[in-house]
Amino acid sequence: MNEFLIRKAKKGDKDAFCRLMDEQVQSMYKVASAYLKNDEDVADAIQDTILSCYENLKSLKQNRYFKTWMIRILINKCRDILQRKKQITYTDQLPEMPFYEEEYASKEWAPV
């Protein structure tokens, strides 16, 4: 781990942050791929992690734990994606039910 890049990135050096992330992309890809099956979801998790790391880098207390901190953020992002996907119900997976009009049309027009 390049502590020099971490220190520079914490001071606001965008190039140092980009180089730091370039060093970590392969590790992030491996971890995210273990959690997520879809490459688009993996890319989203990595992108969200990079953004979160950029926004919160100053909160990192010990530079030597940067990778652990970053991977924990990535895992949380992966879990968020999995949770969102779990809440989505696809219409092709719903049981077929009769349409309202078909079921009640004869009753509505029936003589009273």
Segments from the language model and where they lie:
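Extreme N-terminal regulatory/targeting segments of RNA polymerase sigma factors
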Residues: M1-F4
